[in-house]
Amino acid sequence: MDMGLFDFSIGANIILSAIVGCQLATTFELGYFGLVVGSIATGALVGLCNGFFYVKLRIPSMIVTAGLALIYESIANYMAGGVEQTLPSSLRALGQMPGNIILAVITFIIAYGILNYTKFGTYTYAIGSDEFVAKNMGINVDKFKVLAFILSGAFFGAMAVLTISYGSSMVAVTG
């Protein structure tokens, strides 16, 4: 992250997000809506948990996210029932050309726009450059750190969509 934080729960976030998205798309028959929205929302929720525990407990982000990764993998394994989650072929368009390129370009444009044209992006770079100065300038550093974890989690959710669509299946112990 641009703030100097480390997130070691990326793999677990992708696994959990992919399994939730796959279950929403297949079990609840929500199709692409369930796959995309479910995966991105789950990724953002995982990011919220990471950010909350990091900010409130004041434990280094490496330790918090490494520990939470084990919890996320356990939740994913429990949700999947220990079996492989398979995405039907009718929902795999985002894992093949040109769907995967379109999704990747959309996420790149969103990330670029957020980091270069919003107050959040400016504050992110300010906190990454010097957290002490940013705090003295009146930036609520803790709030923006949590938001950074949420945003990165949402992008990991988008990666989960690509992963499950390309591979067509996910096992909770893949990562």
Go through the PLM ranges and name each one.
Residues 141-156:
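Start (N-cap) of specific transmembrane helices in multi-pass transporter permeases
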Residues 1-28, 54:
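Single transmembrane alpha-helix segments in multi-pass membrane proteins
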Residues 12-16, 32-41, 63, 101-106, ...:
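Hydrophobic alpha-helical transmembrane segments
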Residues 29-69:
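Alpha-helical transmembrane segments within multi-pass membrane transporters and channels
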Residues 6, 157-174:
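Non-cytoplasmic
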Residues 57-120, 144-147, 166-175:
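Transmembrane helix-bundle core of multi-pass membrane transporters
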Residues 23, 28, 48-56, 79, ...:
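Membrane-interface helix caps of multi-pass small-molecule transporters
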